[in-house]
Curated annotation (Swiss-Prot):
The modification (3R,4R)-4,5-dihydroxyisoleucine is found at I11. There is a cross-link at I11-P18 (Cyclopeptide (Ile-Pro)). Keywords: Hydroxylation, Thioether bond, Toxin. Major toxin belonging to the bicyclic octapeptides amatoxins that acts by binding non-competitively to RNA polymerase II and greatly slowing the elongation of transcripts from target promoters. GO terms for molecular function: toxin activity. There is a cross-link at W12-C16 (2'-cysteinyl-6'-hydroxytryptophan sulfoxide (Trp-Cys)). This is Alpha-amanitin proprotein.
Length: 33
């Protein structure tokens, strides 16, 4: 469970920046595709 929290917390922190959030969303979308 700790590893899941460690990966999710940084994502929420990055989400504070719209531009960076969009890049992360694009990376996640391309990775899942």
């Amino acid at each position: 469970m700790s590893d899941i929290n460690a990966t999710r917390l940084p994502i929420w922190g990055i989400g504070c920046n719209p531009s960076v959030g969009d890049e992360v969303t694009a990376l996640l979308a391309s990775g899942e595709a």
